[in-house]
Structures are given as structure tokens and as C-alpha cells.
Amino acid sequence: MSARMRVPTALLVAVALLLAGCSSGKKQQPKAAQTTSPPSTAAPAAGPLQLQLTTSAVGPERGFNPSQAAKRVTPDLQRFLTHYLTVAFLQPQQAKKGWKDFLAMFDPPVRASAKRQLDALALGSVAPKVTAVRPGRAGARATVLFSGNRPAAATVTISFDGTATTAQGSGPVRVHSVLQLVAGQPGWRIAAYDSKAGEDAR
């Protein structure tokens, strides 16, 4: 099962403009001033779900420290992505609440689409049959775009493997997604996605 929600035009324009500003004069800058950071790898999250997150940062060239920026933004991003996987796959009872907690992580313009595509984004229609999910490997790679001193957007590639238990036995749970995030108040929101679950996620 797969689902795709295109990035809204306004977001594409904003990211394009910011990237254009970031790349201005790039060839004239010394190597140390380049805006792509060495990966900053966060420690696994506490608890049964251990998400390995690698973060890079891109931003204005002058006065921007990509390594420090990546290190600073990683904890919040780690919490957001861990919560995303938790409510999507480790809490089958979310189905009884209409996936309210999960859908709240999406930007309002794409929530209706996400609700229609839960089978590719979360446990979806099989959730009522699932009694528990044992997490396996979980990994993510994020590139965060900064505007000034603040994160503005991020592209995240995230994968999760687990084992679901039902009354009939157990089976694999797999997802591979590319999430386009926007930063705001109170925090990160998913503005667009391309997600595959089950056999499609191989």
C-alpha cells in the first residue's frame, strides 16, 4: 500500500527561495563555510522504540554553523519522529479514537488526505485486529532547512520494521516514508508525504 501527498505550491516556493538565498556565493566560500553539516547522530530514544536519527542542517552561509544547528535541532526532531512512529504503529487503540493523535501531526490542509490513506501511513484498517506491536529497526535521516537561526522545514526519510500480534498469530509491519515537515507553533507538522507500507515498503 502506498500513498503520496504533494508538497503545497506555497511550501515549494518558500523552500526554493530559501535555498536560492543559501546557495548565493557558494563557490566563493571556503570549504569550512559550506552549509551542509556533517551528520549529527542522536542516541536511541528511551524505551522499547529506538529510533536512530541522523540530522544535517542547511542555512545561510555567512555566520551559520551547520554542525551546531544540526545538533541543536536533533532532540526536538527525534521526539517528533518517535511520537509519529509510536502513535502510528505501537498504539493500535488509536483507531478507536479516529486516529486523532496521529492526524494532529499533519498540517491542516493535508489531514483529510492522510485520513484516507491510513493504510499506507499507519496500522490503518488492520489496527482493530492488532493486540500489540513489537518494534524492530527504526531509522531516519533528516535534512533541516534553517531560516536565520530557526528551523523552517525538513525532509525526512524514515523506515520502521516491527511485528504485529493478533488473535490469529503474528506478522511483519513495515513502512518507508519521505516526510516534508514545516516548523511552526507549537512544533513540527507534516506538510506532505510519500509513504509505502507492507510489501511495498521493501
Task: Annotate each PLM feature.
Residues 23-48:
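Short, low-complexity, disordered segments immediately C-terminal to signal peptides
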Residues 96-202:
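Structured, amphipathic secondary-structure segments that form assembly/contact surfaces
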Residues 1-11:
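Bacterial N-terminal signal peptides that target proteins for export
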